[in-house]
C-alpha cells in the first residue's frame, strides 16, 4: 500500500503522523511511504532522516493526497485537506467529530474511510491511541494553568505550591480518567491542594489508593462540583465520553460564584468542552476571559511538546496502522477494536455517539464494510 504523511497545518501543530522509526516499520512490511517535505521539522527530523528510513519525499500535501491509499496524520483534517480526500482512501488520525459538523460533512462528501484514534479500543475497555496524548495533556494542563495564574497573564497571582507560611493554590480536577490522573499527579507534585471529582466510585477508590491521601477525592454531585469550583484557584476540565460531545458540567451561571481571576483549563475542548463558556483557542492566542475568569482552551495542547508527544503517539498508533496498511478494510472487519475506531465509511457515519450528537443515522460498521 502507498502510505502518506502530510505536514500538519493546524495552528502551532508541530507533531507528525509518522516518525522516521515508524516509516522503517511500514517499509519493512513492504509498503511505499511518502512524507511531505519538512513534515518532521517540529520533532527535529529532517527530510534526510525520512529518506534514510526508506520514505520518498513529496514536494507538497497535494502530492501525498493524490498518490497515497492511506493518509496518516495527527490532528483532524482541516478544510483545505477535506477537498483532497477521496473515495476508497483510508484516513487514520484524530477526528473529534461530535462537536464538528463541518468536518463531518467534508468527510461524508469525500467518501473516505476514516478511523479516529480517539475511539479505537482495547481488551480492557481503554482507549489506547488516546491515552498517550491524554497523559501529555493532563500534565500540560497544570503547566498552562500555573502560567495563566500569574498576575501578568490575568490570573490571581498565586503559586501552585505556595511557600512556607503561605497556603498553596487549590486545584479542582473534574474527571478522574487518564487526563485527570496526570493533571492531579503533576499538581500534587508541585505541592498544590488537589481535589478530583468523578462519578465512578470504583475509580475514586483507585485514585485514593494511587495517591495515598495526597489528594482529595469527591463524588461529582452538583453540590460537590459547585463547592469545588467556587473555592478553586485552578479548575481542570478532564471529562470524556468516548466519541461523544463532552457534557457541559460547569454552566455560565456558575462562573459568577467563582473567584475573579481564577483559571479554567478545558482539556475536553477537543470534544466541545465541559464548560458552557468554552470555545477553542490556539497556542498563539490561548486565553480569554468571561466574567473575570481566565479560560485556556487550546485544542491541540500536546502539539506544544512535539518531540515527546509525537513519539508517544507513534508508539501507540503503529500496530493498528500497520494492520490497516497490510490488510486494508479486512483489518477493520476482523478487529472489533478497529471497528470501534471507524467513524465514517463511504459517506455513512459508523459511530453512534457521533451520529447522535450531529443528527445522522448510525450504521453498524459490519453492515457497510462489505468485505468478502
What function would you assign to each model-found segment?
Residues 2, 8, 79-169, 298-300:
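Glycine/serine-rich phosphate-binding loop and adjoining beta1-alpha1 elements at the start
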Residues 2-110:
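An N-terminal-biased, well-structured beta-alpha scaffold segment characteristic
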Residues 6-45, 152-240, 287:
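Glycine-rich phosphate/diphosphate-binding loop of Rossmann-like nucleotide-binding domains
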Residues 69, 75-76, 95-96, 221, ...:
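Short glycine-/small-residue-rich Rossmann-like dinucleotide-binding loops
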Residues 76, 136, 177-178:
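Residue-level detector of alpha-helix initiation sites
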Residues 118-159, 269, 274-372:
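Adenosine-phosphate binding glycine-rich loop
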Residues 209-291:
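Rossmann-like adenosine-cofactor binding region
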Amino acid at each position: 500500500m502507498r502510505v502518506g504523511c502530510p505536514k500538519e497545518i493546524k495552528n502551532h501543530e508541530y507533531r507528525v503522523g509518522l516518525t522516521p522509526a515508524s516509516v522503517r516499520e511500514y517499509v519493512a512490511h513492504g509498503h511505499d511511504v511518502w512524507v511531505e517535505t519538512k513534515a518532521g521539522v517540529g520533532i527535529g527530523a529532517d527530510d534526510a532522516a525520512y529518506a534514510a528510513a526508506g520514505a520518498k519525499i513529496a514536494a507538497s500535501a497535494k502530492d501525498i493526497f493524490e498518490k497515497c491509499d492511506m493518509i496518516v496524520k495527527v490532528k483532524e483534517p482541516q478544510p483545505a485537506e477535506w477537498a483532497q480526500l477521496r473515495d476508497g482512501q483510508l484516513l487514520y488520525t484524530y477526528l473529534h467529530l461530535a462537536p464538528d459538523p463541518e468536518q463531518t460533512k467534508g468527510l461524508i462528501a469525500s467518501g473516505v474511510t476514516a478511523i479516529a484514534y480517539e475511539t479505537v479500543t482495547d481488551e480492557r475497555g481503554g482507549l489506547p491511541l488516546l491515552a498517550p496524548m491524554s497523559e501529555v495533556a493532563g500534565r500540560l494542563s497544570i503547566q498552562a494553568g500555573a502560567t495563566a495564574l500569574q498576575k501578568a497573564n490575568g490570573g490571581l497571582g498565586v503559586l501552585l505550591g505556595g511557600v512556607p507560611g503561605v497556603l498553596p493554590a487549590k486545584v479542582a480536577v473534574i474527571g478522574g480518567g487518564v487526563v485527570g490522573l496526570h493533571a492531579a499527579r503533576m499538581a500534587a507534585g508541585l505541592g498544590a491542594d488537589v481535589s478530583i471529582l468523578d462519578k465512578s466510585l470504583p475509580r475514586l477508590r483507585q485514585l485514593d489508593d494511587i495517591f495515598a491521601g495526597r489528594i482529595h477525592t469527591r463524588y461529582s454531585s452538583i453540590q460537590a462540583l459547585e463547592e469545588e469550583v467556587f473555592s478553586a484557584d485552578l479548575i481542570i476540565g478532564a471529562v470524556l465520553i468516548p466519541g461523544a460531545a463532552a457534557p457541559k458540567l460547569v454552566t455560565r451561571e456558575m462562573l459568577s460564584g467563582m473567584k475573579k481571576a481564577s483559571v479554567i483549563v478545558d482539556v475536553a475542548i477537543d470534544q466541545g468542552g465541559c464548560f458552557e463558556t468554552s470555545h477553542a483557542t490556539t497556542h498563539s492566542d490561548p486565553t480569554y476571559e468571561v466574567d473575570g475568569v481566565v479560560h485556556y482552551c487550546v485544542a491541540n495542547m500536546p502539539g506544544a511538546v512535539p518531540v515527546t508527544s509525537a513519539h508517544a503517539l507513534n508508539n501507540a498508533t503503529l500496530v493498528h496502522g500497520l494492520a490497516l496498511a497490510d490488510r486494508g478494510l479486512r483489518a477493520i472487519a476482523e478487529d472489533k477494536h478497529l471497528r470501534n475506531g471507524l467513524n465514517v465509511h463511504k459517506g455513512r457515519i459508523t459511530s453512534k455517539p457521533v451520529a447522535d450528537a450531529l443528527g445522522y443515522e448510525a450504521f453498524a460498521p459490519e453492515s457497510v464494510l462489505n468485505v468478502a
